[in-house]
């Protein structure tokens, strides 16, 4: 619903428009709110990943513009000064720091998973690298180097597999042809379309 700046209708007319479009407006508001809060960092937030939990905690003993990291068992705690978390620049820096920490602590798991899936399908890869991009979650070079983003660690297990299997299919078809999708679907045990659709709807809890 668009109301131009030169609109001269009555308040009652505007109310009637809102009532007529109430359901659609609710859906739009819900979608916008979910997208906004999904990638927002705040005190007490817990982010669940396959390996465990990421906990964000405000702590007055932490110096300004600093982050203290503690790992115990299956949890990594990121502590920061309470006054910092309201800063958009600090949130951006904290997001980058969290992703670096994930890559350092769990990047080896993505490498192992990629090698295991390649071996399962009888594929040979030259190397596995861990990237940090959010827009491009995976890449396969013509020389057989597979790059998997650390952001994949934020995905559930089956979507991690989808990203990796998608790139492994590029070892055979360096395009997105019908043959490529047929092979990718084979690797995904018939779930390629469903997993692709699920990935498109996934809201990452951390955004750069």
Which residues does each predicted region cover?
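Active-site-proximal or metal-binding-adjacent scaffold patches in catalytic folds
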Residues: 1-161, 171-208
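Walker B beta-strand of ABC/ABC-like P-loop ATPase nucleotide-binding domains
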Residues: 164
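Walker B catalytic acidic pair
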Residues: 167
């Amino acid at each position: 619903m668009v109301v131009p700046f030169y609109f001269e209708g009555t308040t009652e007319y505007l109310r009637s428009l809102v009532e007529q479009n109430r359901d659609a407006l609710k859906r739009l508001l819900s979608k916008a709110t979910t997208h906004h809060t999904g990638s927002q960092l705040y005190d007490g937030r817990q982010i669940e990943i396959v390996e465990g939990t990421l906990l964000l905690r405000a702590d007055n003993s932490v110096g300004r513009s600093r982050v203290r990291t503690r790992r115990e068992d299956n949890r990594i705690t990121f502590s920061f000064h309470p006054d910092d978390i309201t800063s958009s620049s600090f949130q951006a820096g904290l997001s980058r720091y969290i992703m670096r920490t994930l890559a350092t602590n769990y990047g080896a798991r993505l490498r192992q998973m990629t090698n295991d899936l390649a071996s399962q399908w009888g594929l040979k890869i030259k190397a596995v690298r861990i990237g940090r991009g959010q827009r491009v979650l995976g890449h396969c070079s013509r020389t057989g180097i597979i790059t998997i983003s650390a952001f994949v660690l934020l995905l559930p297990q089956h979507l991690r597999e989808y990203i990796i299997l998608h790139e492994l299919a590029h070892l055979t078809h360096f395009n997105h042809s019908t043959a490529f999708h047929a092979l990718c679907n084979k690797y995904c045990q018939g779930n390629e379309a469903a997993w692709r659709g699920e990935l498109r709807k996934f809201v990452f809890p951390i955004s750069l």
